[in-house]
């Protein structure tokens, strides 16, 4: 489970507007002209700053901020939270309604388990009035113990709930969403890592609403690519798996069973299974990584065909977890957004409160998915017209 990775699913598309993490996709197979058309189309939509800028601060708050942003080696004191990371206390009717509904259906959310800082905005509906919560599949207990993640752990969590696929699909159907994001805990105690359970949930969601777009943030399944294949062939639209951090820090940040190269192999295999599948990953900043290491990680991700990249600030969930080494400024996050676009990601979502599925991401991905569907329909109609001509001849 991840913070940036698992940190939530959120605000989704309703009538073409929605919300969660601004991502995008760049398939190396995409031709230049279609790519430009997509970018032009997105220009008319909401900008990244419309979604992720915290209304409680302005640019002067961080350009004039004189607080300490980085812990030096050997220092034990925790850094004070800078103004751009402070969020409102969650409340309101929408927030309470979603919380009650999730409890009634016995569904877990990564929003709560991972202590996401955006929970009030997403559950409350935010500026655009669309609300949702990231459904965390396979229970609320993970078999891994990553040092950044607050999801509880156990060697053998409770058995899977056979009603979860149906309950999840029913909740999503009642929200009337066009785009939904799922995530899950790791279940190393299961022979298939839970891949068939995840696939069954996706199929049930699609059965109840064939027009909905589904994104799933899935585990690495211990590197078992057959399990990856099960999820990739379930009818999924966007397959996400998080790299989490740079290679040098992976052994200290993630569970020992989660390896950097293994995650790259998972992301590579998704494209080999289905070249048109949109892939997505996330990186946490503030754990002590260098600019050179971030740059190399981004290049590694492009080399395996990753389409969407998100970068966000690591925030220590409890005193038992890794301390923040550095609070990265919004200006630096903007630099990585620009660099990601230069490296070929169709869109890079980069900001202090960005999580793997936060705010405007679904808008951009939905635009591309709809564009692809329209292109496929036009090709089909053109082929049908050609067949008619041939028959007449």
Swiss-Prot record:
The residues listed in the UniProt record as binding [4Fe-4S] cluster 1, with positions renumbered to this chain, are 111, 116, 122, 357
Predominant localisation class: mitochondrion
Keywords, ordered alphabetically: 4Fe-4S, Iron, Iron-sulfur, Metal-binding, Mitochondrion, S-adenosyl-L-methionine, Transferase
- Name the pathway: Protein modification; protein lipoylation via endogenous pathway; protein N(6)-(lipoyl)lysine from octanoyl-[acyl-carrier-protein]: step 2/2
Cofactors named for this entry: [4Fe-4S] cluster
Instruction: Write down the EC number.
Output: 2.8.1.8
Which protein is depicted? Lipoyl synthase, mitochondrial
């Amino acid at each position: 489970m991840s913070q940036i990775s698992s940190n939530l699913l959120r605000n989704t598309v309703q009538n073409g507007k929605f919300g969660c993490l601004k991502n995008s996709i760049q398939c190396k197979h995409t031709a230049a002209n279609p790519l430009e058309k997509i970018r032009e189309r997105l220009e008319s939509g909401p900008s990244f700053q419309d979604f992720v800028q915290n209304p409680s601060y302005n640019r002067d708050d961080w350009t004039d901020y004189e607080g300490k942003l980085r812990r030096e080696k050997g220092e034990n004191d925790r850094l004070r939270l800078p103004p751009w990371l402070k969020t409102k206390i969650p409340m309101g009717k929408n927030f309470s309604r979603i919380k009650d509904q999730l409890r009634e259906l016995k569904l877990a959310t990564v929003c709560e388990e991972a202590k996401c800082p955006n929970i009030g905005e997403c559950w409350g509906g935010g500026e655009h009035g669309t609300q949702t919560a990231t459904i965390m599949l396979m229970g609320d207990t993970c078999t891994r113990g990553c040092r950044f993640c607050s999801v509880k752990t156990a060697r053998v969590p409770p058995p899977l709930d056979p009603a979860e696929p149906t309950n999840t699909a029913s909740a999503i159907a009642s929200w009337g969403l066009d785009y939904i994001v799922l995530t899950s805990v790791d279940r190393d105690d299961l022979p298939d890592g839970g891949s068939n359970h995840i696939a069954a949930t996706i199929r049930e969601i699609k059965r109840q609403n064939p027009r909905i777009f589904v994104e799933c943030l899935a585990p690495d399944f211990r590197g078992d690519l057959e399990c990856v294949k099960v999820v990739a062939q379930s009818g999924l639209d966007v397959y996400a798996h998080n790299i989490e951090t740079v290679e040098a820090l992976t052994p200290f940040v993630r569970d020992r069973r989660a390896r950097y190269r293994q995650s790259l192999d998972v992301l590579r295999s998704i494209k080999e299974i289905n070249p048109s599948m949109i892939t997505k990953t996330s990186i946490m900043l503030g754990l002590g990584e260098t600019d050179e290491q971030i740059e190399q990680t981004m290049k590694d991700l492009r080399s395996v065909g990753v389409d969407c990249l998100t970068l966000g600030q690591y925030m220590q969930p409890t005193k038992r977890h890794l301390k923040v080494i550095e609070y990265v400024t919004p200006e630096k996050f903007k630099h990585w957004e620009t660099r990601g676009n230069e490296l070929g990601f169709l869109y890079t979502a980069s900001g202090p409160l960005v999580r793997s599925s936060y705010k405007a991401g679904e808008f951009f991905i939905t635009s591309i998915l709809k564009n692809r569907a329209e292109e496929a329909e036009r090709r089909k109609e053109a082929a049908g017209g050609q067949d008619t001509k041939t028959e007449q001849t």
